[in-house]
Amino acid sequence: MRYITAGESHGPQLTVILEGVPAGLTLTAEHINKELLRRQKGHGRGRRMQIETDTVEIVSGVRHGMTLGSPITLIVKNDDFKHWTKVMGAEPISEKESKEMKRTITKPRPGHADLNGAIKYGHRDIRNVLERSSARETTVRVAAGAVAKQILKELGVEIAGHVLEIGGVEAKHISNLSIEEIQTITENSPVRCLDKTVEQEMMDAIDNAKSSGDSIGGIVEVIAEGMPIGVGSYVHYDRKLDAKLAGAIMSINAFKGAEIGVGFEAARQPGSKVHDEILWDEEQGYTRKTNNAGGLEGGMTTGMPIVVRGVMKPIPTLYKPLASVDIDTKEAFQASIERSDSCAVPAAGVVAESVVAWELAHALVEQFGKDRMELIQQNITQHNKYAKEF
């Protein structure tokens, strides 16, 4: 499976085309809209989320609530486009139009794609860069993730995400929660945190950053249960599932780090405390005593829960802008200010769920049959029986 997205932040719409989704998957706009709504929530979101409704329109690949096996096209309209019709229109603008009408930007913002993108593509108007590099694009990545989650659900895999840290405020580790319990708790938390004792402290940190014109980042974790043993491959570097998951996390706007299982903590522990001992019994088959590997060894699943974390840096659009240089005059200026969030970590957690879900669903479809859901389900059932008796 693969997908491609298109659209600008203040353009008429965002589009995603999904290829390789099996036939026979139950899919409705309601499934996708539920995930889009989750992305819009979270303490610290900016005014843009008060403008956009973010509802999907399925325009191909689905008939009467069932996927056809052909490419699926999803679009999400940008409600804010009505205020940007002239600025973001596709037709040429006359020479008489002023810079103000075009809303031309010549001052790149530190921490963004602005300067590097302008140099790469030769744009003298940095708006041409920021409109596409904006995290607004993750709207349709969440839509794609919603389709992947539906695949996982029908294949017996559950997934959930939560926030571990915001602005230096750390949540306590809470173990032995089911995926359903994690989902319930986080959906009722304004910061998607499992630890209620630090919830208010996280919100205070966000509010303090906002009042001072600053921004803060954090850490999110995604957990998936129900993956069969042996999904992925050790044979080639580009087939290793952990590599794909790390790449997916790092592809999210403003994410600067990824780890699986105990991650970087493994560097501080001896091997005897890191590696997960193998157990077997007639009821479960092969299991592990611990899950320090985060459900992945040698680029393949172990049958234990997949545990992936991502680090999001503070959003670089600040209301007390950093120093920059005008690309036209080369004079020092304060960077341009675009409407932004003070903290998007809770929403980014939803995006992280989506990209992890896509990679897991892709791996299952690739390994167990690409054409139709019924065949994939049969093959996974047969594989699980084989793995248990191996």
From Swiss-Prot:
SUPFAM superfamilies named among the record's database cross-references: Chorismate synthase, AroC
Annotated CDD domains: Chorismate_synthase
Cofactor note: Reduced FMN (FMNH(2)).
GO molecular-function terms, A-Z: chorismate synthase activity; FMN binding
InterPro entries: Chorismate_synth, Chorismate_synth_AroC_sf, Chorismate_synthase_CS
Annotated Pfam families: Chorismate_synt
Disulfide bonds: none
EC number: 4.2.3.5
Top enzyme class: lyase
One GO cellular component term: cytosol
Protein origin, superkingdom: Bacteria
PANTHER family: CHORISMATE SYNTHASE
Official protein name in the record: Chorismate synthase 2
The organism of origin for this protein: Bacillus cereus (strain ZK / E33L)
